[in-house]
């Protein structure tokens, strides 16, 4: 076996039920923060090099040994002209060798360097850390879809506008009108909650679902391992879409989101509308019969 090689495979939880089950063990942290499981296979001496990530990560040693050197340093300058973001001045403060079953947690921007000691495999459980700019852009795009209806159809009026000597100057009244239009578009607090939930449950670009088999009657159901389901006080979110929910059906759907399955006893409490929606999700491949 050649030395100093590393193979990284991202999003393995989307393709393997066993890895998806491993990721479920980390749901003591909200699903809104869960991202994916990456598997790193390396031969003797293999590693990415000293670097840092912009997100929290748990490093679980699955096979063999890997030596980790880590440090919380302020100097995050990078080696120039490198395809990978490698730290130019890495200064480790701690040094550990992880054996199978050992795990290391690293917060964002914590410098680290992992080197295989013999053939090894490491599972990296990563967590998403939304950035304000990205989050604002995504939410504004989603909010814009209902902005026209929310803001209404009032027309700008300037009947008292006097003649001007500087025609290129922006009228203050028009600026205030624009500000008022934006405030009206955002006046519904549930609109922001809906946009956030849809964004957080949007499947990744490399995820697609195949149409499922439609059972004659649902006895029990489970979420597809690739499905993202969350909820707030007023909505249910699944794979980038949202539904208003209340009462017994809301409790049932929240349990599906938390437990990722519903038993036959629980399904007997569902209304005809909820059962119809579950059948629709089965057809989409988002949910599957569990029996």
Regions found by a protein language model. Give the residues of each.
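Short acidic, hydrophobic short linear motifs in intrinsically disordered regions
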Residues: 252-270
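C-terminal amphipathic alpha-helical segment
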Residues: 140-216
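Active-site region of the double-stranded beta-helix
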Residues: 1-102, 110, 115-155
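Residue-level recognition of conserved beta-strand edge/terminus positions
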Residues: 105-107, 290
């Amino acid at each position: 076996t050649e030395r100093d090689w590393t193979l990284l495979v991202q999003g393995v939880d989307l393709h393997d039920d066993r890895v998806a089950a491993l990721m479920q063990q980390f749901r003591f942290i909200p699903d809104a923060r869960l991202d994916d499981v990456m598997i790193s296979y390396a031969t003797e001496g293999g590693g990415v090099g000293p670097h840092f990530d912009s997100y929290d990560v748990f490093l679980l040693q699955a096979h063999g040994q890997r030596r980790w050197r880590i440090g919380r340093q302020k100097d995050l300058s990078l080696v120039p002209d490198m395809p990978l973001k490698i730290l130019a001045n890495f200064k480790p403060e701690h040094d550990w060798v992880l054996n199978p079953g050992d795990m290391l947690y690293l917060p964002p921007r914590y410098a680290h360097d992992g080197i295989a000691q013999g053939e090894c495999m490491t599972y990296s459980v990563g967590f998403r850390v939304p950035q304000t700019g990205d989050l604002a852009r995504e939410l504004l795009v989603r909010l814009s879809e209902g902005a026209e209806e929310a803001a209404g159809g009032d027309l700008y009026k300037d009947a008292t506008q006097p003649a001007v000597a500087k025609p290129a100057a922006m009228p203050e009244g028009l600026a205030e009108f624009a500000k008022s239009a934006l405030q009206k578009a955002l006046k519904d607090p549930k609109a922001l909650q809906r946009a956030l939930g849809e964004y957080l449950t949007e499947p990744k670009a490399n995820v697609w679902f195949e149409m499922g088999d439609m059972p004659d009657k649902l006895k029990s159901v489970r979420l597809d391992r690739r499905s993202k389901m969350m909820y707030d006080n007023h909505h249910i979110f699944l794979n980038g879409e949202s539904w208003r929910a209340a009462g017994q059906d809301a409790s049932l759907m929240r349990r599906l989101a938390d437990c990722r399955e519903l038993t036959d006893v629980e399904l007997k409490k569902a209304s005809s509308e909820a059962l119809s929606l579950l059948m629709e999700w089965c057809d989409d491949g988002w949910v599957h019969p569990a029996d």
